[in-house]
Amino acid sequence: MSSNIPAELKYVASHEWLRLEEDGIITVGITHHAQELLGDIVFVELPEVGANLAAEEQAGVVESVKAASDVYAPIAGEVVAVNEDLPSAPETANSDPYGAGWFFKLKPANVADYDVLLTAEQYAGEVD
């Protein structure tokens, strides 16, 4: 499997990744595959802290020199944090999509929703 799809994360077909943190909060970002398709990212719009998002609801926008794409909430929950550094350094979503390039953090409405998302292996099958 590709090293660009970390095994410890969960994924959705719309190319967002999720990481369940020890405190039960879920960190969300776009995948390496998504940033590769977009090319050089030049603008990021993030959701508002406190927003309650439904699963698959638009949570933000990412724009590159080639295209604009919506970013979706992979599961329902309340936005508890956004990556304050990303709007001023959107290229971080290209250079470190699974680390410093995260987009927002959700307090899931139902943490069990996390368990049914795509594994790294399943997501790899989606993008091959």
Swiss-Prot record:
Keywords: Lipoyl. Transmembrane segments: none annotated. Residues 25-107 form the Lipoyl-binding domain. Disulfide bonds: none annotated. PROSITE patterns: BIOTINYL_LIPOYL, LIPOYL. Binds 1 lipoyl cofactor covalently. It holds the Pfam family GCV_H. The modification N6-lipoyllysine is found at residue 66. Its cofactor is (R)-lipoate. GO terms for biological process: glycine decarboxylation via glycine cleavage system. GO terms for cellular component: cytosol; glycine cleavage complex. InterPro entries: 2-oxoA_DH_lipoyl-BS (IPR003016), Biotin_lipoyl (IPR000089), GCV_H (IPR002930), GCV_H/Fam206 (IPR033753), GCV_H_sub (IPR017453), Single_hybrid_motif (IPR011053). CDD domains: GCS_H (cd06848). It comes from the Bacteria. Belongs to the GcvH family. The glycine cleavage system is composed of four proteins: P, T, L and H. The glycine cleavage system catalyzes the degradation of glycine. The H protein shuttles the methylamine group of glycine from the P protein to the T protein. NCBIfam families: gcvH, PRK01202.1. This is Glycine cleavage system H protein. It comes from Neisseria meningitidis serogroup C / serotype 2a (strain ATCC 700532 / DSM 15464 / FAM18). The gene is gcvH.
